C-alpha cells in the first residue's frame, strides 16, 4: 500500500531499483528444499544451539518449534515475498523515468537538507558541508601526491597489493587483542572487560550480509558481544585490521559497552536505555569511521615493530586513498540530490579519477540515487568529530589530551553534533 501510494504520487523508485527489489524478493522466496533456505537453516542453527546450552526445551518441543517455523515459511512468509514482487511489478509503468536526485521533486531540496540533519546529526548549512568535504578531499589528495612523489616505489603495481601478504596479524581474535593494547593510552578503560566472540556468518546468510558487522547487543545485556565476519568477502591484512577497529575496538563494540556501563553501579543507566530508542547515526558511524582512521596509525606501529618494509608510507597511502574515495562519494551525493547532477556529469567526474568501466559508474550512481546521505552519515559524522577535536584543543589548551577528548566524546554519548559542541563549550 505504501509503495502504491508513492507511485500514485509520482514518487516511485526508478526501473533499475524496482528490478533489483523484485529480483531480490523472488530469489529470497525461491527454494528447492525448504531445509536449505537461509531462514530455516538460521532458525534451526540458533534453536539447536539454545537447546544445547540451556536444556530448557525437550527434543519434542524443539521439533515442534522447527515444524512451526517451516509452516510459517512455506505458507505465510515466502508467499508474501512473491506477492510483494508481483504487486511491485504491476507498478512498473509508474517508475521514475528520469533517474534524477531528490531535488527534481517538489520540495526535494528541503527534504534532502532535512534528511542530512536527521541522518548525520550535523546542523551545518549545505555550503559549509561542501566546504568541509572539499577541504578534506584536497588535503588527502595533496598528501597522496606528496607520498607518490617522494616514494616512487608506490607506483609499482604490486607494492600496495602485496602488503596484505606481509601484514603481521591474520587472526581476528589476535587483531582485536592488539587493538585493545594499542588504544589503552588514549581511550578510557571499560569498567569490566566484555566477552567478545568472533563468528563466521552462516553459509545460508553469506549472500545477504556485509563483509563484517558488530551485532548490537540488547539494551539489558551488553556483556556478551559478537562480531561477524563474512567469508564471502576476502577481508585480510590491513583491511581486516581497520575493519575490526571499526566494528570492535575502539569502534562500535567498545563505544556501545562503554556508554552502557559507565554509570551502572547499583541503579540502571536510564540515560543509556533512553538513547537506545533514539537515532544518532552520524555519531555512531562517524565515531566508528574516526577510530578506523586512527587504526591506520596503530597498523603503522604494528608493522614497523614487525620489520615490515615501507609500512608507514603504504599505510598512509592507503588511508589517503580511502578518505578520498568516501569524501568523493559524499560530494557526489550532494551533487546528485541537491545540485541536480546527471548521470553523464557524474560519469565524467568518475572517469577523471580512473573509474572507467560503465558498469562501475552506473552502480555508483544508482547506489547514491537509492541511498541519499548514507555516505554522509559516516563521513560527515567523522569530520564533525575531527572538528570537535580541534575545538577541544583550543578550549582546553595545555590540558588537552587525546584521552581527555575521547573520554568527553564517549561519556557524552550518542547525540547530535550541535549538542556535543554545546557540551564541550559549556565545560570550558
Where are these regions (language model features)?
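N-terminal maturation segment of proteins
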Residues: 1-428
Amino acid at each position: 500500500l505504501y509503495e502504491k501510494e508513492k507511485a500514485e504520487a509520482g514518487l516511485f523508485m526508478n526501473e533499475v531499483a524496482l528490478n533489483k527489489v523484485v529480483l531480490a524478493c523472488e530469489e529470497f522466496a525461491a527454494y528447492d528444499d525448504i531445509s536449505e533456505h537461509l531462514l530455516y537453516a538460521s532458525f534451526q542453527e540458533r534453536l539447536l544451539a539454545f537447546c544445547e546450552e540451556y536444556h530448557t526445551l525437550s527434543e519434542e518441543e524443539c521439533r515442534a518449534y522447527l515444524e512451526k517455523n517451516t509452516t510459517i515459511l512455506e505458507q505465510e512468509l515466502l508467499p508474501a515475498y512473491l506477492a510483494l514482487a508481483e504487486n511491485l511489478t504491476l507498478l512498473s509503468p509508474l517508475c521514475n523515468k528520469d533517474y534524477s536526485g531528490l531535488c527534481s521533486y517538489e520540495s526535494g531540496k528541503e527534504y534532502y537538507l532535512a534528511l542530512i540533519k536527521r541522518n548525520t546529526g550535523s546542523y551545518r548549512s549545505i555550503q559549509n558541508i561542501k566546504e568541509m568535504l572539499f577541504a578534506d578531499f584536497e588535503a588527502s589528495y595533496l598528501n597522496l601526491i606528496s607520498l607518490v612523489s617522494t616514494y616512487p616505489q608506490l607506483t609499482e603495481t604490486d607494492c600496495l597489493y602485496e602488503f596484505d601478504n606481509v601484514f603481521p596479524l591474520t587472526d581476528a581474535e589476535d587483531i582485536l587483542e592488539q587493538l585493545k593494547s594499542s588504544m589503552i593510552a588514549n581511550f578510557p578503560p571499560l569498567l569490566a572487560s566484555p566477552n567478545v566472540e568472533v563468528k563466521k556468518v552462516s553459509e545460508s546468510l553469506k549472500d545477504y550480509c556485509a563483509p563484517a558487522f558488530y551485532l548490537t547487543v540488547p539494551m539489558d545485556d551488553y556483556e556478551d558481544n559478537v562480531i561477524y565476519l563474512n567469508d564471502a568477502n576476502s577481508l585480510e591484512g590491513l583491511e581486516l585490521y581497520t575493519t575490526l577497529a571499526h566494528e570492535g575496538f575502539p569502534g562500535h563494540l567498545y563505544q556501545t559497552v562503554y556508554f552502557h556501563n559507565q554509570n551502572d553501579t547499583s541503579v540502571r543507566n536510564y540515560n543509556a536505555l533512553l538513547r537506545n530508542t533514539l537515532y544518532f547515526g552520524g555519531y555512531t558511524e562517524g565515531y566508528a569511521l574516526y577510530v578506523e582512521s586512527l587504526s591506520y596509525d596503530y597498523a603503522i606501529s604494528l608493522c614497523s615493530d614487525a620489520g615490515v618494509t615501507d609500512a608507514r608510507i603504504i599505510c598512509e597511502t592507503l588511508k589517503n586513498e580511502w578518505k578520498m574515495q568516501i569524501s568523493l562519494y559524499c560530494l557526489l551525493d550532494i551533487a546528485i540530490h541537491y545540485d541536480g547532477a546527471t548521470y553523464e556529469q557524474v560519469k565524467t567526474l568518475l572517469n577523471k579519477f580512473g573509474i572507467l568501466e560503465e558498469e562501475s559508474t552506473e552502480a555508483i550512481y544508482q547506489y547514491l540515487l537509492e541511498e541519499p546521505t548514507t555516505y554522509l552519515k559516516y563521513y560527515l559524522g567523522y569530520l564533525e568529530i575531527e572538528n570537535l577535536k580541534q575545538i577541544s584543543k583550543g578550549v582546553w589548551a595545555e590540558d588537552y589530551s587525546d584521552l581527555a577528548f575521547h573520554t568527553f566524546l564517549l561519556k557524552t554519548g550518542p547525540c547530535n553534533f550541535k549538542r556535543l559542541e554545546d557540551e564541550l563549550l559549556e565545560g570550558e
